[in-house]
Amino acid sequence: MTIGIDKIGFATSNYILKLNDLAAARGTDPEKLSKGLLLKELSIAPLTEDIVTLGAAAAEPILTAEDKEKIDMVIVATESGIDQSKAAAVFVHGLLDIQPFARSFEIKEACYGATAALDYAKLHIEKHPDSKVLVLASDIAKYGINTPGEPTQGAGAISMLISSNPRILAFNDDNVAQTRDVMDFWRPNYSTTPYVNGLYSTQQYLDSLKTTWTEYQKRHKLALKDFAAYCFHLPYPKLALKGLNKIMDKSLPQEQQDQLRKNFEASILYSQKVGNIYTGSLFLGLLSLLENSDNLKAGDRIALFGYGSGAVSEIFSANLVPGYEEHLSRTRLEELDQRQALSIADYERIFFEEAELDAEGNASFSGYEDQSFALAEIAEHQRKYIKVEKSS
């Protein structure tokens, strides 16, 4: 029995901030962002959009009524939690009308959380091969106006339906993880934005990659020559490119080195238009690779490197299933290009707006007509979500 990704989906906001505009407003050389980060645009989420609405929007298009009857576990991986007690997965479970006899919970470890969620889902399917697990990696990366991290913000969610006999990717039982207690990036409960030691975090990312990759090769007797592509956690694509350069085997035939680099370019196309989505960034890269590479084929082995500050890293691999390409979109880049670009003033107002509650903890919201799901109101401190009905 194989276990892996049977379906995969993605959702992001309808608003973008062009990094050339941000560079002009902040007095920064545009090439510092376009070449220094390899980013072009950032997804900007309004107040009515959060990890619940994005997660539900990513999942709804890929799920059938039969899927919703077979799903008995919903996991949301996030570091953008909207409640200290109630899991976002519970809200999503209700919005998607999934059958009631299911576990729903949240996983947190910075940007690593979704990789941990896949590990948990895989173990569950091993014991219950007829069930399905919905894994959502949903986050809003928000650093603040005129901060060093401002050009690496973003918003979005990846949905993955995990099952036996999957139709896209089959996991290999080869995971190698590493934990190191470091303070490269953190967000205390009292802060709405994170604290970042940027250079130190870059060093931790690259060293975690190098040491985990060395251990992975030693344990499994595999090398870079055994892989058609390598996907990385993508806080910004330039960091992942540094990672690829660090592990590149110069003894490989030039043709294979070129294939790995070409597939890396395919894997960053979506992130360049979305920005950082924390837990979902690795899997947005995977989706971008699968939908944009012109050289992958069934049976190819893909390596994946997950990293979450603090820090936990993990390397694992999966093989493409025959017919995988039939379950992917070929129009996503065009759809991303159709979103509304914001002025700097509108970006600052929309992205950093906070709910203004009255004395009883109430607030109502509007302007969410273009969303699939929305935070419509807060009533007595309770978040109320709706599925947005589209007018014909």
Segments and roles (model prediction):
Residues 1-48, 147-203, 207, 316-392:
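Condensing-enzyme catalytic core mediating Claisen C-C bond formation in acyl metabolism
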Residues 5, 51-112, 221-247:
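Conserved beta-ketoacyl condensing-enzyme motif
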Residues 9-11, 77-82, 109-114, 137-142, ...:
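Acidic, glycine-rich active-site loops and adjacent beta-strand->loop/helix elements
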Residues 29, 51-66, 88, 204-220, ...:
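Short, well-ordered amphipathic alpha-helical segments that serve as non-catalytic structural scaffolds
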Residues 32-36, 40-50, 80-132, 249-281:
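Conserved catalytic cysteine-centered active-site region
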Residues 126-159:
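Flexible, glycine-rich active-site loops centered on histidine and acidic residues
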Residues 199-220, 225-248, 270-275:
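A conserved active-site cap/scaffold subdomain adjacent to cofactor or substrate pockets
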Residues 287-337:
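Catalytic phosphate/nucleotide-handling subdomain of diverse soluble enzymes
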